[in-house]
């Protein structure tokens, strides 16, 4: 609530200080120089002729080359730099006559965070008049765009970039949970909706490029930016990253720029020395964990932007590495967009890494490596002028410059900047940004991100009718700052946990509130290693909370972290609750009243005492502006929590690195017997494992089936199972599928995530699920660092977490030579036709159930199909005298006697003609193979 008041005062002050044009924002935007704007095209170079690059119907690459040929070196190099927006580097909110004399008179590649109101890092409060409403903001960005279109020689539009990992970073926009919270929803469709809304609101505000998603994989829970990752599984990060990019880039509304490439999130000891140096990983670990998400998101979602990181890997700074930015990113992954540096990454080549002697050498290294656009908090001259000097001196070829500029122009063409450079629907911006439908998705995300960690004796949900007095305390109970951090909306209305509870219980219960303690104490972080006594003021505040708890029916304690303890450059040396939070919790627990602990934080915390003594615990991460409403719904049973952990909770910081996936037995050691005479020397096991999360209801897993059970490396198998809600409440279950390679040429992971689905079931409802297992789940990097699928057995495990496996089965992969030999060794098929096998033909094609062909395990019957027939299902009536379950396979052949399995399963029902579908294939012969004895086929229909 407080931020709305601040925003009103801010805008009121701006009205007095700044000249505002127009006085009233129009409903639509129409540029002034109408002679440039022709019917169906724009005369960007003002020559009166429709050049190829100005023709929307011309091929993309032809438009790029036509424009590139017309550009001077000065114009090309200006495209290779970002200009930070108002109050960052740019001192003007709107274009001034001086702009025609500055560097960007020749254009600019991108302007970042312009007029978005960002105020961090000691900058003065935003005093621009264009921060809100959305229509006025869009109008202002249009005016800036108009300078580049109308007042530069070639009229190349600027790419307006902005942050957006939890909603677009504008003063007002739809505010979602932090990306770590979004990961805990495990909901692909929801993540796509988040991307769609973020991209749509960004474009309506005037932005064309969103720096999202974060594709870093969390591996060290101490790391400050842990709040920004989806989780610690590369498969999950890739799956959600794909959906986020598809949403953002829907209809090319904006470009999505994933970050940070590469090997960024595992710096030594989680320390952040600005350059994020010395990540501790083997080459194979980098590929399996950190490169995997980027590779899949680029290939499967067509991501148009990548931000290069400023760490080194094995002594080579990524931002200066041709191997990473060109050989791998473009050559192997097929990336076709542009690479922008993280802020100051180019400078770090000589100021931090020491691999360049000066700025000019740093520029050369980065551009030769593959960098397209440099981003920094300094004037663009500091990059562009050395770049021009290098070309003129022969230190860089202009062809390298051309290659880099081609990528930049390609993105600008793809997102429509040369066809529609302005956001013309200004009134639409006011309708779209923060509209009711978007806010509903934000609330859904807040609901689905919450994880129930403990619920002893079913304390939750609370009965709103019998709970008459509620004590609420904790530093995060009435805090809203967690929803207003960098990289997302800055001044939205936030419902705190206290406000959510008060609104939910209005007229039904009395809510007693006191803070209890601050987020950290005066000595923090030193107090993590030295036990300072409580001050009188600290003790008095805890005493107030205790007195409230004694009067109440239940105490709700809201603890965790915030901007002081987590975020960029805020890594920790401990995972314990900071400050006096544990002492507050222990004092409340000592009252004997039921206690519910809510955690609002950006990283897993080692809450061992709470796990042992507090009956109910909810993990909410940073739940967005709707977090208080969502948590109140969960506390009182209006929503059943269904989030699952995408990260591991260690019991102690001494276990780190401790994460998923891991190598066999790598996270367990030190003996098994505790005590003075035992051999246990350290704490083992996770406090809460990857995939863990409880519910107010229960779920049963059954009927696992894997057809076919034998495949070749390039074939796929389907895993089927059934999940039933066996409880009394409707709820969500995140069904997880894991895979383990039983025998391999290198050490592989103990288990790896291979699939997941979030489903909603009413009480008693059952749902059949299917997962596809294909090459991406089976391959490994062999001893020669080549991706291969090795023949052998793979165990497939379905369950409610990585440690709560309910069902398992085995899939076998055989190589092509083994398959060919097996086919050749098979006995001749019993071909059914009227001429060669009249008895079989009569028995299975006479449309009579009471006549049948019978076989035993390994027997098969083959049917000749019409030449070139396409078959996608077969109806079969099986019978068996003992009615025991039986399995079978359907195989097809295109000729030459080689058959491939297209269906493997269990007989659904005896004595009835049942249809068994499979992927449609053209074939000449069809075979049914029995896997059990004394099974009869009474009838077959194609």
Regions found by a protein language model. Name each.
Residues 880-942:
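Trp- and acidic/polar-enriched beta-sheet ligand-binding modules for extracellular glycan
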Residues 755-761, 785, 850-854, 903-906, ...:
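Beta-strand-rich interaction surfaces with strong enrichment in secreted/lumenal proteins
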Residues 715-719, 859-861, 870-872:
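Structural beta-strand segments of beta-rich domains
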Residues 16-779, 790-798, 802:
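Glycoside hydrolase catalytic-domain context in secreted enzymes
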Residues 1-23:
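Bacterial Sec-dependent N-terminal signal peptides
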Residues 48, 816-867, 877-884, 905-909, ...:
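Disordered, acidic Ser/Thr/Pro-rich linker "stalks" and the adjacent N-terminal cap
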Residues 709, 724-730, 866-868, 879-881, ...:
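Short solvent-exposed strand-capping/beta-turn motif centered on an Asx-Ser/Thr pair
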Residues 757, 765-771, 859-863, 912-916:
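Short strand-edge motifs at loop-to-beta-strand transitions and within beta-strands
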């Amino acid at each position: 609530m407080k931020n709305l008041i601040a925003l009103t005062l801010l805008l009121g002050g701006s009205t007095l200080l700044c000249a505002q044009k127009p006085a009233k924002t129009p409903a639509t935007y129409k540029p002034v120089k109408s002679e440039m704007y022709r019917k169906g095209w724009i005369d960007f170079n003002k020559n009166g002729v429709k050049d190829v690059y100005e023709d929307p119907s011309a091929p993309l690459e032809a438009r790029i080359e036509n424009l590139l040929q017309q550009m001077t070196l000065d114009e090309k190099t200006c495209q290779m730099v970002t200009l930070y927006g108002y109050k960052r580097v740019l001192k003007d909110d709107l274009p001034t006559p001086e702009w025609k004399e500055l560097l960007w008179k020749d254009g600019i590649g991108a302007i970042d965070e312009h007029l978005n109101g960002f105020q961090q890092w000691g900058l003065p409060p935003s005093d621009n008049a264009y921060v809100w409403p959305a229509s006025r903001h869009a109008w202002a960005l249009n005016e800036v765009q108009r300078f580049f279109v109308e007042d530069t020689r070639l009229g190349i539009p600027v790419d307006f970039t902005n942050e957006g990992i939890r909603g677009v970073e504008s003063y007002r926009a739809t505010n979602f949970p932090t990306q770590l919270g979004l990961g805990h929803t495990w909901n692909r469709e929801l993540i796509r909706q988040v991307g769609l809304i973020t991209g749509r609101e960004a474009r309506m505000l005037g932005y064309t490029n969103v720096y999202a998603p974060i594709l870093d994989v969390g591996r060290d829970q101490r790391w400050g930016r842990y709040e920004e990752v989806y989780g610690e599984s590369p498969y999950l990060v890739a799956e959600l990253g794909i959906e986020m990019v598809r949403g953002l880039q829907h209809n090319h509304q904006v470009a999505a720029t994933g970050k940070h490439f590469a090997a960024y999130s595992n710096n030594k000891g989680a320390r952040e020395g600005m350059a994020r140096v010395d990540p501790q990983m083997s080459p194979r670990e980098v590929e399996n964990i950190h490169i995997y998400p980027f590779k899949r998101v680029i290939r499967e979602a067509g991501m148009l932007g990548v931000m290069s990181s400023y760490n080194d890997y094995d002594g080579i700074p990524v931002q200066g590495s041709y191997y990473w930015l060109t050989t791998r990113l473009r050559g192997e992954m097929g990336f076709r967009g542009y690479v922008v540096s993280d802020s100051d990454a180019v400078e770090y080549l000589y100021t931090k890494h020491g691999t360049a002697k000066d700025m000019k050498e740093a520029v050369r290294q980065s551009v030769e490596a593959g960098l397209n656009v440099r981003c920094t908090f300094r004037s663009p001259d500091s990059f562009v002028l050395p770049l021009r000097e290098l070309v003129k001196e022969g230190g860089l070829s202009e062809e390298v410059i051309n290659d880099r500029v081609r990528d930049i122009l390609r993105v600008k063409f793809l997102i429509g900047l040369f066809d529609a450079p302005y956001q013309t629907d200004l009134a639409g911006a006011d309708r779209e940004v923060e509209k009711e439908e978007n806010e509903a998705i934000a609330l859904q995300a807040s609901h689905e991100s919450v994880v129930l960690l403990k619920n002893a004796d079913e304390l939750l949900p609370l009965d709103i009718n019998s709970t008459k007095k509620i004590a609420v305390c904790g530093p995060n109970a009435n805090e809203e700052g967690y929803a207003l951090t960098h990289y997302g909306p800055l001044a939205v209305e936030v419902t705190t946990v206290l406000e959510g509870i008060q609104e939910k219980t209005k007229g039904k219960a009395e809510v007693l509130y006191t803070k209890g303690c601050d987020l950290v104490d005066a000595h923090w972080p030193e107090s993590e290693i030295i036990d300072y006594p409580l001050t009188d003021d600290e003790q008095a505040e805890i005493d107030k909370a205790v007195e409230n708890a004694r009067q109440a029916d239940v105490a709700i304690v809201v603890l965790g972290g915030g901007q002081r303890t987590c975020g960029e450059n805020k890594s920790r040396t401990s995972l314990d609750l900071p400050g006096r939070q544990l002492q507050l919790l222990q004092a409340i627990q000592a009252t004997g009243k039921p206690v519910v602990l809510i955690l609002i934080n950006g990283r897993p915390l080692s809450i061992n005492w709470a796990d042992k003594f507090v009956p109910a615990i909810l993990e909410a991460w940073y739940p967005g502006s709707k977090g208080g409403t969502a948590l109140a719904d969960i506390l009182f049973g209006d929503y059943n929590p269904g989030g699952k952990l995408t990260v591991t909770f260690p019991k102690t910081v001494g276990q780190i690195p401790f994460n998923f996936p891991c190598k066999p037995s790598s996270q367990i050691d030190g003996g098994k017997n505790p005590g003075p005479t035992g051999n246990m020397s350290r704490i083992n096991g996770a406090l809460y494992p990857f995939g863990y999360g409880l519910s107010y209801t229960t779920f049963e897993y059954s009927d696992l089936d894997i057809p076919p059970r034998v495949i070749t490396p390039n074939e796929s198998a389907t895993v089927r199972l059934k999940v039933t809600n066996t409880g009394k409440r409707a709820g969500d279950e995140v069904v997880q599928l894991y895979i383990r390679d039983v025998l391999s040429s290198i050490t592989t992971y103990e288990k790896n995530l291979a699939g997941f689905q979030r489903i909603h079931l009413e009480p008693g409802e059952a749902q059949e699920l299917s997962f596809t297992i294909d090459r991406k789940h089976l391959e490994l990097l062999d001893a020669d660092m080549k991706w291969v699928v090795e023949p052998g057995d793979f165990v497939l495990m379905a369950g409610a977490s990585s440690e709560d496996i309910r069902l398992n089965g085995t899939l076998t992969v055989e190589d092509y030579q083994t398959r060919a030999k097996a086919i050749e060794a098979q006995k001749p098929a019993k071909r059914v036709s009227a001429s060669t096998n009249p008895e079989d033909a009569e028995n299975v094609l006479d449309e009579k159930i009471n006549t049948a062909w019978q076989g035993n395990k390994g027997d098969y019957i083959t049917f000749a199909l019409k030449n070139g027939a396409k078959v996608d299902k077969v109806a079969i009536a099986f019978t068996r005298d003992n009615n025991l379950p039986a399995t079978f396979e359907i195989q097809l052949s295109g000729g030459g006697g080689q058959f491939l399995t297209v269906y493997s399963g269990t007989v659904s029902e005896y004595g009835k003609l049942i249809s068994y579908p499979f992927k449609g294939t053209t074939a000449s012969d069809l075979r049914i193979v029995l896997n059990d004895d004394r099974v009869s086929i009474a009838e077959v229909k194609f």
